[in-house]
UniProtKB/Swiss-Prot annotation:
It catalyses: isopentenyl diphosphate = dimethylallyl diphosphate. Catalyzes the 1,3-allylic rearrangement of the homoallylic substrate isopentenyl (IPP) to its highly electrophilic allylic isomer, dimethylallyl diphosphate (DMAPP). This is Isopentenyl-diphosphate Delta-isomerase. Its main location: cytoplasm. SUPFAM superfamilies: Nudix. Keywords: Chlorophyll biosynthesis, Cytoplasm, Isomerase, Isoprene biosynthesis, Magnesium, Manganese, Metal-binding, Photosynthesis. The active site is at 62, 110.
């Protein structure tokens, strides 16, 4: 199935095939989700079959909305598809932009809607092995140190989020 994502071409938002957007480094829409619980953040290790950054640790969920799909709807859909997570309310935090080389001649140039949710105790993710090979609850207080200690094991965008946008993402993140 060919997936078309909202991409800016010559200043106009248009549906462009996802791989083409990455090969050309075109600016496109994306979402990122951070699920928290009791001071921890849920990280996922990307499946080895992913076409870029396989086997690297990332935030809870990140993807691209399909053409004409709202960011929050996309976030909820992918939480379910990747991690079997349903019915966790998400709060929009902000929209940020970054550009990163993700290897293999691919560039992520994303305008990202960031969402944060709180997973209740007793609820656990159920990994889709085509998308996720491992999950881990990591203390928010030590996440940046862990990424700094082993930078090659984390996605470029997680580095960027922690370096440039952590205050936006995590400030009052657990408030109702």
């Amino acid at each position: 199935m060919t997936i078309h994502i909202p991409t800016w071409v010559n200043g106009t938002l248009q549906p462009v095939e996802k791989l083409e957007a990455h090969l050309r480094g075109l600016r496109h829409k994306a979402i990122s989700v951070f699920i928290l619980r009791d001071g921890d953040v849920l990280l996922q290790r990307r499946a080895m079959g992913k076409y870029h950054t396989p086997g690297l640790w990332a935030n809870t969920c990140c993807t691209h909305p399909q053409w004409d799909e709202a960011g929050v709807d996309c976030a909820m859909r992918r939480l379910d598809e990747e991690l079997g997570v349903k019915d966790v309310p998400l709060r929009y935090r902000d929209t940020v932009e970054y550009r990163a080389d993700v290897g293999g001649g691919l560039i992520e140039h994303e305008v990202v809607d960031i969402f944060v949710g709180e997973m209740p105790s007793g609820m656990e993710p159920v990994m889709n092995p085509e998308e996720v090979m491992e999950v881990e609850w990591t203390p928010l207080a030590t996440l940046a140190q862990r990424v700094e200690a082993s930078p090659e094991t984390f996605t470029p965008w997680l580095h960027i989020y922690l370096r440039k946008y952590a205050d936006i993402i995590f400030e009052s993140a657990t408030d109702a």
